[in-house]
Amino acid sequence: PNFGKIQKKDKLKIGYMPQSINVINTMPMTVKNFITVRKKYDDISFKQVISEIDIKHLVDKQLSVLSGGEMQRVLLARSLLNNPDLLVLDEPAQNLDISGQLSFYKLIQEIYSKRDISILMVSHDLHLVMVSTKKVLCLSNHICCSGKPQQVAQDPEFISMFGKDMANMMAVYQHTNHTSQIDNHLIDGEIK
């Protein structure tokens, strides 16, 4: 940054989910072994994560037989095992069909709602990003624009990169979780 101050929480735990991994078909590794290898964990945490991600039925399967959607869920579970403060997702819905993408983004929303966690997601799925995030940061060799999805869709730099048609086609809506803000005053979707 050119100005300001960057503050980092002491002992910040980061969970990282890559967009994919190369699985060697001849290497026998179960889902449970993959999730827990090189991770300090307890059985309760493991059981909670596989339940939350809905992969209990996969734990004894070999990685090599998983579908694309199953593998994405396994990668997500692995990134959540140590209860991170920050979850970094690199193209988490890549190679999923549209229903798989919607299901996966819904799961990410549920994780965000249930956990005290920040999520940084890299994605090229503009439509899904614009409807499922609170803040968008648009990069093209520099920060082109950032803000709430509604603001970004109307930003001149966004429009110059993607065109007016794309900005007008964006199905942008704002979802606000009112249940967690009972004691504060909610005005125009923001706590004031």
Predicted regions: what they are:
Residues 123-124:
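H-loop/switch region of ABC-family ATPase nucleotide-binding domains
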Residues 83:
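Conserved catalytic motifs of ABC-family nucleotide-binding domains
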Residues 154, 161-192:
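ABC ATPase nucleotide-binding domains
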Residues 43-60:
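Conserved ABC ATPase "signature" region
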